[in-house]
Amino acid sequence: MIPDPKIFYQTYLKDYHGTKATYLKKILDDLPKYEKEIFDKELDEEEKDQFRLTLKSDLRQTYFHAIETFFELFFALNPHGKQKFDDLNVLYNLANSAGPETYNKISKIALNENSLEFLDEKIKFSEFDISIGHYLFYMGIFKAATMSKELQDEIDKSIDAIKYGLKILATDFINREEYNAYKHGLRIIPAVKAFMLGDVKTNEIKIKWDLSDSMSFYLKSKSPNEVKIITKLSDISRDYSMTMFCSRLIYHLIFYRRLTLKFEKDAEKYKKFPITFFGKEPIAKCNKVNVAIQDLEYTMTLTESDLEIQSTVNDKT
C-alpha cells in the first residue's frame, strides 16, 4: 500500500534535530546531574571524559545530519527548472534522491556566489505570482486578503537572510571527511590533548592551546607513505545554534505545507499561528566561532621502520 503523501507533512518529525540538539545541550550543561541519573553510579575521570565527548560528538553529528536532511527536502520540493510543483511527490523524490548528485548541488551552493539567486525568481502558483523562496519557505502565506505590503517585505527580507544562512550550511557540509568519520563506522578519536609552539634552542614553550576537547580523524594522503590527521576543537555553542537554525528551516518547509492541506485535526489547533522570520544578524550570531583553533591539520610520513612494523602487524592479522 502506498501511503497518502499528504500524511508525510502531518506526521514528519519536523523538530527532530532541534529536539535532539536541545536535550544534548541540556545534558552537557549539567553533566554531574545526568551522570548519576543515566548511569546510576559514580563515574571515574576517564568515564566522565568519554561521556562528555560522546555527547559533544553526537551534537556535532546531529548538526551535519540536520544539514543533509534540510537539503534533501529543499531539493525535493524546489520547483526551479521543473515543469511542476512537487509538494505531493515529496516521498518519491526523497526515495529517488542520489547522494552524489545531492552533494554536487550542495557544493554549487557553497562555491558559487550566485547559486541561490533563483530563490528570487517569480513563479505562478495557483493565481498568485510569488518568488520561489516564498513558495518554499512560506507556503500558503500569499493570499491577497491576508498579505499586506509590510508582511511581504518581511518575507522578502527573511528569504534574503535564508540565502545567507544556506551558504554557511553548505560550506560546513561539503567538507565530508569529518561527517564520514562519524557516519561510516566510528573513525574519530580524542587523541590530541594540546598544541604547543616552543623555542627550538631553549625548548621553552611560548604558546600552548588546550585541545582536550578535540577529536581527530585520519585521511588518505596522495602519498602511500603519508597519513593526514585533522583535529577539530569542539564548539558546542556554534554546533547547537546552527543546528537550531537548520532545524527551523526544516520546520518552515514542512509546517506551512501541512497547514495548506487543511487536516481536520489542525482546524481548531491552528486557527491562529505565528509567522516566523529569519534575519542575517541572528544567523551571523549563530555562526560565531567560540574556540581559539578550529582546524589543525598535519601530515605524518611513515618511515621505513614504521612500514616494517605495519607489515609485521598485517602479517599477523
Write out the residue ranges for each language-model feature:
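Alpha-helical protein-protein interaction scaffolds
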Residues: 59, 63-65, 72
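Short, solvent-exposed secondary-structure capping/transition elements
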Residues: 69-87, 188-193
